[in-house]
Amino acid sequence: MDPIRTSRLRAPLLASALLLAGSSVCAAEPDLETELRLNAMIGDTETAAELLDQGAHVDAPNQFGKTALMFAVEGDDLETVALLLSRGADVNARTVAGCTPLTFAAEAGHIGISALLLERGAHVHDRTRSGWDALMIASRHGITDMVEQLLFKGADPKAADREGRTALMQAASKGETGVLPLLIEGGADLEARDKQGATALLIAADQGQAGAVETLAGLGAQLDAVDALGSTALILAVGHGHVAMVERLLAMGADPNRQDRKGTTALMEAVATDHAELIDRLIAAGARTDLKDDADRTAADIAVQLGHRQAIARLAPKASKTP
């Protein structure tokens, strides 16, 4: 069989796949390497083997740096992955963006393929250009089996990306609660901070991930930790209007009267957006109306300044009773 020839049945699939594999739309026919990547992509192990026998370079990349092995990994094609590795494919090859076969497997959750890659020498600590390793990627997608496998193989749960974010922070930002205990058991630092001074709990609060906040607090994370600007989880949640998050934080004992570096309280944040429901909940939880920010303004002053009628209606009577 001529591996360059394609059947009529597969022609529509191959035509679109050729572009992904790296073939020029103007080419009369793809070269051996493009055909290899293509067949790795569609899972044709037999044809891939014949192309290699004809001299196709196993690690030839497309314009984005993707090799046949990476395409096979993405397609969850264990047979083709095994073939390419047996023919000398670089298990640690990198794309232009720094992705490796292992990071592709981690993102897709292909646990069997990642096991084979690791067995063949895949570097568990390799990073993409964004600074993400396979553990961060698997954690972000909540793939518990992959996280367990990578931790067992020595992945570092304390490693951070270019923004200073760890695998725990990645999972927290997406609300992947099932991954969080695994990372803590594996040695992740609950109170590690990114470049903005935020902990995993603060990141979860900022993203409205109430379940993640509750899980992290249950694991021992500080509820009233502050970021570089002095904001607490409660202040961040109020600022984004995350009602369910605010309710949980208050129920867990978050202090409604903490102030950030500019003196802003959670109540002032609620007033700034004229969020009546949050104003009521914060006041009911003991938020003080007499606290002032660095501009010497109370929450009522801010409400009047902004012309927020709902806030004024709720705060004016209370402000007048303040001694």
UniProtKB/Swiss-Prot annotation:
Pfam families: Ank_2. Residues 1-28 form the signal peptide. ANK repeats lie at residues 31-60, 64-93, 97-126, 130-159, 163-192, 196-225, 229-258, 262-291. SMART domains: ANK (SM00248). Keywords: ANK repeat, Repeat, Signal. This is Ankyrin homolog. InterPro entries: Ankyrin_rpt, Ankyrin_rpt-contain_sf. Transmembrane segments: none annotated. SUPFAM superfamilies: Ankyrin repeat. It comes from the Bacteria. PANTHER family: ANKYRIN REPEAT DOMAIN-CONTAINING PROTEIN 39 (PTHR24171:SF9), ANKYRIN REPEAT DOMAIN-CONTAINING PROTEIN 39-RELATED (PTHR24171).
